[in-house]
């Protein structure tokens, strides 16, 4: 008779202990998992997305969760089991919770776990990391808001809409292909310190939501769709702007693809990855959009051209800080796999000041934009950067080497989105 599996993990699911029964049930030697993997490795990805959070909440609320589910052994074999989960505490239940203990017993029953449509939708969002596309879409809206605010009939509405969808699909393709190349390099597999939903890639391959080959196929399909939309945009673009649109688009695709793809793998080249993100999510995207939607010859209108360039600078800088702060928890695994970004190059302690410098540059560049436009309303997003950005930096400064840093990671993402939305609104007036 197979022994019961007993496994303990911390609050983030990282495996801390496992008994002999766990090795027998799941087929992994404990040396391969303890301190290196998370308990999600035992479950099908869709069950992780749909059920696990509910199990843990019930365990915390009632002191125990008991249920039946499917698990996966190291050899890929699926089996049916009874699972019992309890919260764990360091020194008694009156102290803060430290993790969970799970007891798994193999059962001779046919267990079917129905997967909801909403879970399948979440699966698609997870594989493509769609929620992060706001970083590329909001700069497009900012350019549209600028042209709408300074005059009438300055831009092609149809091309504006096509740009939104084209950039959206292109961003998704880059996300998926980045996961593919990180999978080949072993970067995401090596990473056990990631912050859930923030750093460490989508985890879609690691959770079994999609295969490595599947990411390659999906990324290729999305790229082709983006190119078709881009071709349509060109047919509607002012002929005087076509060359600029093609040049900027090719530059963006080049940077997006070779961000993680060999032989360039820009993310591993000590600052070139961060520069890539700044350009791709900043001036390139705002200038590309401006050339694509402007009804006249944009190169002959230096005022509009430079203003669209300036709009992209703070947005690109803030997106760069999202990347930078997400490199903190990933530093160890990235270093082990040769992903030599700025945090690996300078270390966590020194990289705090890089974050602050980028933040201050975003403040200054927004001030330059406000001065050029004569728009005092842009002082509102500047104030946001100073106040909220200052708070986030204080968290980073103190918590840079702890799991509590996740507050600053989410804060940086939120700040970039709110800033871009605020800029869009102020540019309309």
Where do the protein language model's features map onto the residues?
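Conserved hydrophobic beta-strand signature of PAS-family and PAS-like sensory domains
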Residues: 15-16
């Amino acid at each position: 008779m197979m022994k019961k599996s007993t496994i303990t993990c911390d609050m983030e699911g990282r495996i801390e202990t496992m008994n002999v029964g766990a090795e027998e049930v799941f087929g992994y030697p404990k040396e391969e998992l303890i301190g290196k993997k998370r308990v999600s490795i035992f479950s099908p990805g869709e069950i992780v997305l749909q059920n696990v959070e509910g199990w843990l909440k019930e365990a915390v609320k009632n002191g125990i969760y008991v249920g039946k589910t499917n698990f996966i052994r190291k050899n890929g074999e699926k089996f049916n089991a009874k699972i019992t989960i309890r919260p764990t505490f360091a020194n008694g239940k009156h102290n803060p919770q430290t993790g969970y203990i799970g007891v798994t017993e193999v059962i001779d029953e046919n267990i079917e776990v129905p997967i909801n449509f909403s879970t399948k939708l979440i699966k698609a969002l997870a594989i493509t990391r769609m929620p992060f596309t706001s970083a590329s879409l909001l700069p497009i809206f900012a350019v549209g808001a600028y042209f709408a605010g300074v005059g009438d009939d300055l831009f092609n509405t149809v091309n504006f809409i096509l740009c939104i969808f084209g950039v959206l699909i292109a961003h998704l393709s880059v996300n998926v292909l980045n996961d593919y190349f990180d999978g080949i390099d072993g970067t995401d597999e090596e990473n056990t310190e990631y912050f859930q939903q923030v750093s460490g890639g989508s985890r879609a391959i690691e959770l079994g939501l999609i295969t490595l080959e599947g990411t390659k196929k999906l990324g290729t399909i999305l790229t082709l769709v983006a190119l078709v939309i881009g071709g349509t945009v060109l047919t509607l673009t002012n002929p005087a702007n076509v060359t600029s649109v093609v040049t900027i688009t090719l530059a963006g695709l080049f940077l997006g693809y070779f961000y993680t793809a060999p032989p360039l793998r820009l993310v591993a080249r000590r600052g070139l990855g961060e520069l890539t993100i700044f350009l791709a999510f900043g001036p390139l995207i705002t200038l590309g959009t401006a050339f694509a939607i402007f009804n006249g010859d944009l190169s002959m209108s230096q005022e509009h051209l430079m203003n669209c360039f300036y709009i992209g600078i703070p947005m690109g800088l803030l997106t760069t800080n999202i990347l930078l702060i997400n490199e903190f928890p990933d530093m160890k695994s990235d270093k082990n796999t040769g992903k030599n970004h700025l945090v690996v190059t300078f270390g966590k302690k020194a990289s705090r000041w890089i974050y602050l410098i980028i933040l201050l540059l975003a403040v200054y560049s927004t001030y330059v934009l406000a001065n050029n436009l004569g728009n005092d309303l842009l002082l509102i997003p500047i104030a946001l950067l100073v106040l909220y950005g200052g708070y986030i930096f204080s968290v980073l400064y103190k918590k840079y080497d702890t799991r509590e840093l996740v507050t600053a990671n989410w804060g940086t993402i939120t700040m970039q989105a709110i800033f871009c939305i605020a800029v869009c609104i102020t540019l309309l007036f």
